[in-house]
Amino acid sequence: MKAPIEVSPLAWLDAVEQQRRAAGLRRSLRPRPPVATELDLASNDYLGLSQHPDVIDGGVAALRMWGAGATGSRLVTGDTELHQQFESELADYVGAASGLLFSSGYAANLGAVVGLSGRGALVVSDAYSHASLVDACRLSRARVVVTPHRDVDAVRAALQDRDEERAVVITESVFSTDGALAPLRELHEVCRRHRALLIVDEAHGLGVRGGGRGLVFEAGLAGAPDVVMTTTLSKALGSQGGAVLGPAAVRAHLIDAARTFIFDTGLAPAAVGAARAALGVLRAEPWRSGAVLRHAGVLAEVCRVREAPQSAVVSVILGDPDVAVAAATACLDGGVRVGCFRPPTVPAGTSRLRLTARASLDDAELEVARRVLTDVLAGLG
């Protein structure tokens, strides 16, 4: 009989934490107060709708009518008229034939990619794809080819060389770390020529591009039979949850095949009600998407970013993770909260400040941002 192991099975965590600290990659949680005490340039509340009275009222009304939780999987007791109404309204807004709600954007990506690929298929994914798409590729059991960032020729080569009958190409419409736009028209043409499905994550495009309807709509691909969109309700719509939007056959298939739909509790009614109200505000106030881009331009100019931003995201690359953390801390000390992205979120050597513009920023707030960011960046030398 072997002697019992004396060391705790979690002892290895101490060494891992020390390695993270040494590399400047230790993370911590910083709770925010209910009323912001600093200027928010870090959240994904692009349209400023999370605190909009109509959005809050929409969530409260759904809460009172349907209760706090969905009470089960949507295949059991978790489906409501509210869920199906919002699915139809969101699909109509972006130009898709149908929609299916998930409990998060992460779950929507897992459900769509895994459900529409599988063993015997090829999945081609951009190197800068979000972690949810990376995990979806790993879970798909398909052969996965990762192509350089926004490289259409590499996607074409991967599709040309395949032996698999089915192929899926995955991209974000607006990449979350650098704010760059995917070359959707070119990617779609390559997919069309090689009989591949194009899955586009519109998490950062919805509400910002295409007058609010997203980059797929802007590119003229809305409603295309070989394009599927995923999105989140937690960014421009200021709520929580996710959705897959596309042909009706895709919705029907995912209801039967997407494990993150079948085995997950349905999205809470309050989240659906809030997102539905936010969509109503977006329809009534299309100026919000243009305001986001204008304000992003101001932030980019202040930070001396060379290229004008094409989304709400302004990326200020600083390189060293410790420098990025120090800069973000200095901004917060000055009253401005900014994002700080380090590996593994971004490649090594590209740690950065990630600023996000909001439609609701006013002139006084932009002036505060200008003053604090100018001082902090000047102090870096």
UniProtKB/Swiss-Prot annotation:
Gene Ontology molecular function: 8-amino-7-oxononanoate synthase activity; pyridoxal phosphate binding
Residues with N6-(pyridoxal phosphate)lysine modification: 235
UniProt xrefs under Pfam families: Aminotran_1_2 (PF00155)
Necessary cofactors: pyridoxal 5'-phosphate
EC class: transferase
Record EC number: 2.3.1.47
Superkingdom of this protein's organism: Bacteria
Reaction equation(s) it catalyzes: 6-carboxyhexanoyl-[ACP] + L-alanine + H(+) = (8S)-8-amino-7-oxononanoate + holo-[ACP] + CO2
This protein's pathway: Cofactor biosynthesis; biotin biosynthesis
Keyword terms of this UniProt record: Acyltransferase, Biotin biosynthesis, Pyridoxal phosphate, Transferase
InterPro entries: Aminotrans_II_pyridoxalP_BS, Aminotransferase_I/II_large, AON_synthase_class-II, PyrdxlP-dep_Trfase, PyrdxlP-dep_Trfase_major, PyrdxlP-dep_Trfase_small
GO-annotated biological processes: biotin biosynthetic process
Entry keyword annotation includes Plastid: no
Binding site residues for pyridoxal 5'-phosphate: 105-106, 176, 201-204, 232-235
Gene3D superfamilies: Aspartate Aminotransferase, domain 1, Type I PLP-dependent aspartate aminotransferase-like (Major domain)
Binding residues annotated for substrate, in chain numbering: 27, 130, 345
Assigned protein family: Belongs to the class-II pyridoxal-phosphate-dependent aminotransferase family. BioF subfamily.
Function: Catalyzes the decarboxylative condensation of pimeloyl-[acyl-carrier protein] and L-alanine to produce 8-amino-7-oxononanoate (AON), [acyl-carrier protein], and carbon dioxide.
Subunit structure, as described in the record: Homodimer.
Protein name: 8-amino-7-oxononanoate synthase
Organism annotation: Mycolicibacterium paratuberculosis (strain ATCC BAA-968 / K-10)
